[in-house]
């Protein structure tokens, strides 16, 4: 029990990094001496279990988180401030995932890998026309879409349901209001239960990552390291550009000094980088907003909302990683599929929980939306490579998520005359 307690209390990030390094070493050694088949038979199943656990969580988290996220936008508070911040969050997320796609095309990660698990190459399905993709967003059977893992229809229904619940909770009819509150409480309970399961699954992550990376290294050799380095570089260069080209430019346009802003924001940014949790960083983020001279009436609404629905860093990561996986499979993503990535990543950001590891679960959802299901062994193998470095990518993307929340809050406060002069503006 003492050893188990020590394992649980040891930081997850460090455990995953240890699993990654040991898996790479073991895989390279065993692969070099011709034991790749043994790794596939005896080690890989532990990694497959990790992937299955993540797949198990995808649709329940998508549905519950999106309903709760959409319902958190109260019509009473939406008003002018709410509309401004929601539009800001959606537009910056769209720019982030587009920037991720651009970075992926520049760095071209995964092109040096040619996956063929069991000698079978990935066989892409013919992409449907864009009009059909858009029409299929509206489900004919929402519960069937949820059960069958159809991502975009589930997102659409969850958002519509969340908005409907919000309006019912503001009904003058007490019975209707209580029914809506009960329904939301139940769905919120489901979401919280899913987050708890995520935390449990992340305790198994070091073992899963060890097994997956050992298998990939035994099969593919050292060339995988270079391709994963490209993914890491593409994500971090993209995240840096998101701060410089989006946040700094917007701050400058609205008369806020970017340097003063960053000096004030650094505590929240560093906390987000270390904890990998937007929600966990929220108390620090709110303190930083107060120190910036932002009115409590603004930041007390925009920052909790941002921790729920604004995930610019995660959206960018999904753009890069989807391209990496497609490249590793030798699959070309059409313009329609790239637009689907943008649409799905932006909508998914509304339901991406602000907890460590949630971004990897949402990536599985984005992959499904462009015809790269984890049920395919080649897709699962490429996804496994991303899981190996996900903790490293998670630190940077969470920092950008929080920086984006603060940027939007400062801009809205400035436009509303709720930003103290002489602090950052």
UniProtKB/Swiss-Prot annotation:
Residues 31-41, 104-121, 219-230, 321-337, 373-391 are extracellular. Changing residue 276 to S: Increased rate of aspartate transport. Pfam families: SDF (PF00375). It comes from the Archaea. Contains eight transmembrane regions plus two helical hairpins that dip into the membrane. These helical hairpin structures play an important role in the transport process. The first enters the membrane from the cytoplasmic side, the second one from the extracellular side. During the transport cycle, the regions involved in amino acid transport, and especially the helical hairpins, move vertically by about 15-18 Angstroms, alternating between exposure to the aqueous phase and reinsertion in the lipid bilayer. In contrast, regions involved in trimerization do not move. Belongs to the dicarboxylate/amino acid:cation symporter (DAACS) (TC 2.A.23) family. Sodium-dependent, high-affinity amino acid transporter that mediates aspartate uptake. Has only very low glutamate transport activity. Functions as a symporter that transports one amino acid molecule together with two or three Na(+) ions, resulting in electrogenic transport. Na(+) binding enhances the affinity for aspartate. Mediates Cl(-) flux that is not coupled to amino acid transport; this avoids the accumulation of negative charges due to aspartate and Na(+) symport. In contrast to mammalian homologs, transport does not depend on pH or K(+) ions. This is Glutamate transporter homolog.
